[in-house]
Amino acid sequence: APADRRGNLVAWNQFAIIFGMLVVYFVNYTIALQGDAAWLNTIGWRWMFASEIIPAVLFLSFLMFVPETPRYLVMRGRTEKALGVLSHLMDQADAGRELEDIRNSFKEKAPSMKPYFRFMGTWLALFLAGYGLLSWAGNTNALEIALLASFCIALLFPIRSFGVLIILVGVLLSGFQQFVGINVVLYYAPEIFKTMGAATDAALLQQIVVGAVNLSFTVLAIFTVDKFGRRPLMIIGALVMAVSMLILGTTFYTRSVGMGSLVCMLIYTAGFAMSWGPVCWVLLAEIFPNSIRSTVMSIAVAAQWIANFLVSWTFPMLDKNQYLTDTFNHGMAYWIYGVMGILAALFIWKFVPETKGKTLEEMEGYWER
């Protein structure tokens, strides 16, 4: 995509995801209205899962019409095909210049991946050793403790390759997108609303409101990401999420949940939708060098799913833990996500460059410097 429109075009991907989720919220709410709570727990949830067959078939069908990316085609020596794809996005002269930039970028020496594999080997060895010792000692949280501790220790090893630095920035960018707790809101919203005192039907309806806010502010990001840049949106969004989560946790702690708690969740969702939702994907599409983009993008996305798993797995533990519930009344988890929001803002400010208006080839030169 052209540098001046790339943020807008990539952000539409997030819009499509959120739009699909909002449709699912409506479908689930409609299914839930067909019976009582007992029916929903025995039969209704099966219909919710079965309804996903329709979009899955449509996705597979439309996937046949998606073209390969120009950079992939150039890497495979199919330059004429790459020029054809570029010509659909810009005029012939600009397409030719863009194609030449892409071809030149592949002539440059790729960053060495050896330090990355050395880092991953160190992390894996530390994880296996830590998990083995904790399991042998009978620790019930051995897996998550070993994962986090081994990664933090591995990060202490010196980084001698800018390729590894790029990978770590991508991995942490993906990780923070999940560690701020967004999928707790998206996955567990009905349960959170029930904790606030809402009935099942009302909780599903409030989830639709969350989805509508998510969609609306994603549209805002689409039309501002190329105007204001990536870094300002990401930093502001992280701070908005941090403040709203800290306040939400406080409403639980002080046993004053109500409309204010719902407003905090909506503000949090808006903060994510205007920043880390779409803009994180824009940055991931822009910061990696052409020569290793596909490999490193896969690593970053894998890190995102690992972080997603950790957050969605640990939230019920934090929320239902008897000691934490008695002491903080369900507030601890939200405070943790608030702190993660602050760390995410600091991470963007310190380590992530502004990519607005820069070609992907220019970004490769930035990392080399």
Model-identified regions with their sequence ranges:
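Alpha-helical transmembrane bundle of multi-pass membrane proteins
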Residues: 1-90, 106-369
